[in-house]
């Protein structure tokens, strides 16, 4: 419900307007900046900034990310990496065999999984699991290790 008269109009004649005699709505009542994160503003920090306090991990300057982590992909998803128009060309012409370099898509390791199409396929990657090798060779395809 809206008020006919603002609060400031109601407080005319009351010197401090509800802000007290000494402080008079001045200075930094809650501390400056982000002060009080562990005491009087703790609820605010835990609700809106839960990771503000404390440490989290460590930066390793000399680590080579690529050698530490190689993103895997299932061999079941290999046919899905070929654009639709090209995929239909390969399905219509059995002599054509697609060559997929998974590193172009940001993957490095091919893991096992049933191929979605029982057609030969050539796959290039940094590493293949034994089950992935078996699955690719079973349909008459080839796997090539690239560095």
From Swiss-Prot:
InterPro entries for this protein: Rbsml_uL15_N, Ribosomal_uL15, Ribosomal_uL15/eL18, Ribosomal_uL15/eL18_sf
Keyword annotations of the record: Ribonucleoprotein, Ribosomal protein
Region (Disordered): 1-34
Coiled-coil positions: none
Superkingdom field: Eukaryota
Keyword Protein transport among UniProt keywords: no
Biased composition (Basic residues): 1-15
Keyword Transcription regulation on entry: no
Family matches, as Gene3D superfamilies: 3.100.10.10, 4.10.990.10
One example GO MF annotation: structural constituent of ribosome
GO cellular component, one term: cytosolic large ribosomal subunit
A Gene Ontology BP annotation from the UniProt entry: translation
Short name of one Pfam family: Ribosomal_L27A
Alphabetical list of PANTHER family matching this protein: 60S RIBOSOMAL PROTEIN L27A, LARGE RIBOSOMAL SUBUNIT PROTEIN UL15
Protein family membership: Belongs to the universal ribosomal protein uL15 family.
Name listed for the protein in its UniProt record: Large ribosomal subunit protein uL15
Species in which this protein is naturally found: Encephalitozoon cuniculi (strain GB-M1) (Microsporidian parasite)
Underlying gene: RPL27A
């Amino acid at each position: 419900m809206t008020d006919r008269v603002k609060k400031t109009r109601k407080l005319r004649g009351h010197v401090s307007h509800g802000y007290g005699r000494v402080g008079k709505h001045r200075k930094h009542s809650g501390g400056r900046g982000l002060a009080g994160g562990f005491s009087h503003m703790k609820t605010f920090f835990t609700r809106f900034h839960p990771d503000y306090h404390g440490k989290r991990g460590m930066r390793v300057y000399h680590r080579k990310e690529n050698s530490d982590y190689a993103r895997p992909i299932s061999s079941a998803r290999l046919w899905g990496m070929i654009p639709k128009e090209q995929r239909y060309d390969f399905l219509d012409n059995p002599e054509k065999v697609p060559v997929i370099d998974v590193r172009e898509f940001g993957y490095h390791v091919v893991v096992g999984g049933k191929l979605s199409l029982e057609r030969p396929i050539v796959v290039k990657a940094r590493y293949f699991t034994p089950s992935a090798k078996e699955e690719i060779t079973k349909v008459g395809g080839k796997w090539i290790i690239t560095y």
